[in-house]
Amino acid sequence: ENLMKTMKELFEILLEHGESENDCMIVTVTKSSGSAPRGAGSRMIVLADGTSHGTIGGGSIEYEATKQALLGIQEQTSFLKDFVLRPNDAADLGMVCGGQITAYFQYVSHENTVFIDQCRSLLANWDQAKQLWLLLDLTEESN
């Protein structure tokens, strides 16, 4: 039930910011290995002002993911990014837990009325919904 509450809050935030004409980024852990702080499916929303909701692990990984999300919002693009959580690697984030995660950064434009309408409909019927799927388009497009 806690996960469902969190998912409902995610859609409420997406709807609120879409209706107020603010773009945002959904950051979802798609793969984790080793001793990563959060597993696949963990997500957070990053708003254009740098505010975030939810978590993908906290600390330096979330700090770096927020920086990447803000760049993606500026460039209006979605992308995959690997984060290494052990010392002395190219993408070292200085976290001692050791491991690696891959995160998908899904850009959500306030102009995407289909997505905003889906959020509105989903929330209006939340209590009747038995099974919900949040689909991510993982296609990497070149800019």
State where each predicted segment sits.
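Segments forming oxygen-rich coordination pockets for charged ligands
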Residues: 2-143
